[in-house]
């Protein structure tokens, strides 16, 4: 199954695995799943690390390269279609990175691995 992993779930999987639910852990680690990673997540993490708002277990580039390699993550780029879709989303969620990830999940018709209950307002299948 194809699915998208959100930023927090990725951080927890790599650095604080014990915070994941069994459902989320299985979704992330099941080799039968194709796990997509939004370019929005890559950018969000870089910004937060650069602003010293987030500390990772390795330097950013090493951390990201290792996460992508270890999980076999498939990068999902930002496209005009995704950007356009997020313009029509209700304002339940204000974070621009999360709004783009929501739009990507909706356009692709895939579940999202996330602890964020606000996502339930968007009709996304949330795995947690």
Language model regions located:
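Residue-level signal for well-ordered alpha-helical positions
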Residues: 16-17, 48, 89, 125
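Short, well-structured N-terminal submotif of metal-dependent ribonuclease cores
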Residues: 1-37, 51-66, 108, 117-121
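Short glycine/serine/threonine-enriched helix-capping/active-site loop
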Residues: 37-40, 78
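Active-site neighborhoods of divalent-metal-dependent phosphate/nucleic-acid chemistry enzymes
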Residues: 55-61, 69-115, 127
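Alpha-helix capping/helix-boundary segments
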Residues: 9, 41-42, 82, 101, ...
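Alpha-helical structural signal
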Residues: 24, 43, 64, 97-98, ...
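Short, conserved active-site loop motifs that form the nucleotide-linked donor/cofactor pocket
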Residues: 33, 73, 124
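Generic structural signal for small/hydrophobic residues in well-ordered secondary structure
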Residues: 7-8, 45, 86, 105
């Amino acid at each position: 199954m194809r699915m998208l992993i959100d930023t927090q779930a990725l951080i927890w999987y790599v650095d604080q695995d014990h915070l994941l639910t069994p459902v989320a852990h299985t979704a992330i680690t099941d080799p039968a799943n194709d796990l997509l990673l939004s370019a929005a997540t890559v950018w969000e993490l870089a910004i937060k690390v650069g602003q010293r708002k987030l500390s990772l277990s390795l330097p950013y580039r090493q951390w990201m390269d290792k996460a992508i390699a270890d999980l076999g993550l498939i990068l999902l780029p930002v496209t005009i279609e995704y950007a356009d879709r997020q313009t029509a989303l209700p304002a339940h969620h204000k974070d621009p990175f999360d709004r783009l990830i929501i739009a990507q999940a909706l356009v692709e018709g895939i579940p999202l691995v996330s602890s964020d209950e606000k996502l339930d307002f968007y009709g996304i299948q949330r795995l947690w």
